[in-house]
Amino acid sequence: MGIFPHGLHGLGLCCIIGAKVTIPPQEDIMAEIRPFVCVRPAEELASRVAALPYDVYNRQEAKEEVQREPLSFLKIDRAETNFDDSVDTYAPEVYQKAKELLQKDKQEGVYITDEDRSYYIYQLVMDGRPQTGLVACSSVDDYMNHVIKKHENTREDKEIDRITHVDTCSAQTGPIFLAYRSDKGIHDIVASYVENETPIYDFTAVDGIAHRVWKIAKKEDVDAIYKAFQNIQQIYIADGHHRAASAVKVGLKRRQENPGYTGEEEFNYFLSVLFPHDELRILDYNRTVKDLNGRSLTQFLEEISKNFIVEKAEGQVRPEKKGTFGMYTEGQWYHLTAKPELFEGKDAVGSLDVSVLQDYLLGPVLGIGDPRTDQRIDFIGGIRGLSELEKRADSDMKISFSMYPTSITELFDVADQELLMPPKSTWFEPKLRSGLFIHEI
């Protein structure tokens, strides 16, 4: 691909993005969560700079957003927005443009560089519900030795774009969304700032989500947070597996290019926001399928009744507990309840609702063999609502399924067992904004 001039692939680094540990296991490895020198927007410009993650837009949507708000970080995160559509999204000049724009914005005062190593508190409020995390840098080695746990496979072709972006800009710009089991010591420090200190940013985005940021620079608080995280033995990637894998690969590439590295260099760490598990909100991730796989509705209902209790419903069905599903087709909603034996003897993955639906209905009845690649299935994030399921089933698709959300405990269980979540299992809201925090490497 040309971005690994010293033979990165020769190091066998693709093996770090899998289930195998690449560092010998050690006893009682503790998380290293470090404060960092942050590059961030000038206070009065933060609301204009902050942008949704690069991967929620297609090229045209990204271009329209940058035209609407020229300061949007998308112009750097998706630098192809600065070019005609004839220019390849992944052309070398696109990444070079991202680097130039970041440097230009720093020179012009759009971004400032803090002088001290700090942590930051990042609070997002959606529908009146706050979610408060800590912005910090996590360790490449913690990722490799599984202190930071994964629950998704990554595809190398999807990593290449972010590897090139980070390496060219020498900056990590999209934070990785991490989760940990709530800790009272960390909670108390964070709560004291939220309750008593003035935020450095406080704005509401056009989508109605409020964003507030506080800076933690007092040495005693910085030291206390650092020590508290050393008592936390497991941290989990909630969202951003490809960004995390890309940041790690750039770090390993830089290590190869700097054989005398000490481990203290910034490329050994990656930008993260860490949230306590009890503040996270996972929404349903719903399914819609193109046809009934050659069956009539009567045949289909009869066949699925072997494994599910099927009941007609009066209106929309939003499942209220694990093991239940909504189903909509031909203008009618149904309530499905998986029979108890479907969960017997299953591991953390097999007992997930998304697995039960796939293993006992989507696969054997509707013929969806691999949901990652099958063109007959589509996935609809819960943020779009149940009406979107009706709309799709009444137009380009045939049948839709509403899911009960995967719980954060289920996600932790899968990661702890070093298993992989099925595709499209979790939909996190609200989305972290890019451009508010930049970590230069």
Residue positions per predicted region:
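Short, positively charged and aromatic/hydrophobic N-terminal segments
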Residues: I3, I16-T22, Q26-I29
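Short hydrophobic alpha-helical segments enriched in small aliphatic residues
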Residues: G7-G10
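Surface-exposed, charge/polar-rich loops and edge strands
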Residues: E27-I441
